[in-house]
């Protein structure tokens, strides 16, 4: 009876130990944060994961990594943090909070978040040969409160307004709006990234008329929806140069018309031609000057309408000034050049007719 009792107690102890081993290696899954976790640039990031069902995890290996299992962001093994195995860019930047490790819950804290911290993080719990993981997606956000607007000097094509802002991540939505909030089509958009991988944004707007008295530059972070904006009010004075330029061209063209009329009258008076004949000198002179004026006007319109340089190019203003100078030069030279050509044509024609008449007279 005594030996039977000892065997019974021994069997109970063995069963208890087996139950303990089975409980300690109970299968589990790893739960964590669902959906993207947003973190501000330069701040701290906390990522949590927990075993289900809850159980103590002090004896387990807990590994956080990004792309490669062998390159841990943080590693916990044999009841301690293995700082020597952490990859270089996370050295002294991570901490594993283990207050709830008795229930299988840990939190990874990352200090001084950078753009490079954007992406996926794997949390792996390993117990012997059994392991499970949870993947958390991290999105880094950065905004710049400074949005600058630069207004260029007006030219014949209008006023160029540029908006600049740097230090954004990810690339923000950037657009122009009027005072009613409606979107204004931009002339150009561009962006660049520095070594810190932050986006530098630039958007340009060419305003040819004073219709948009107030323009607003808006930038919006696509993840947080946070928006920064600044505005500028353009008075009619910005567009006065456009009216002055049209007035100058109008005066020059008027002088050209008057010159054509005067020159035609002189030819008419000189040759005493009273009838409207297509071979009359004054009509030929009028046709020469009219065709010259039409040609110059067409060339000017072509130069002004053709966009050789985009608005965002640094040489856009230089190109516009070149067009203005060429237009003035063409208008200024057209009248004397056309009159000189006409005068030379008629003088040569008279000289040829005079020589022909002399040869005919001599032969007779």
Swiss-Prot record:
The Ig-like C1-type domain covers which part of the protein? Answer: 142-228
Q: Which keywords belong to this entry? A: Disulfide bond, Glycoprotein, Immunoglobulin domain, Membrane, Signal, Transmembrane, Transmembrane helix
Per UniProt, subcellular location reads as: Membrane
User: Which InterPro entries does the protein's record reference?
Assistant: BTN3A2-like_Ig-C, Ig-like_dom, Ig-like_dom_sf, Ig-like_fold, Ig_sub, Ig_V-set, IgSF_BTN/MOG
Q: Its domain of life?
A: Eukaryota
* One Pfam family hit: C2-set_3
Q: Where is the Ig-like V-type domain?
A: 27-141
Query: Extracellular face: residue ranges?
Result: 24-246, 306-325
Q: Which Gene3D superfamilies match?
A: Immunoglobulins
| Topology feature Cytoplasmic, residues | 268-284, 347-364
Residues bearing carbohydrate? 112
Under PROSITE patterns, the record lists: IG_LIKE
Q: What is the name of the protein in this document?
A: Selection and upkeep of intraepithelial T-cells protein 1
| Organism listed in the record | Mus musculus (Mouse)
Q: Which gene encodes it?
A: Skint1
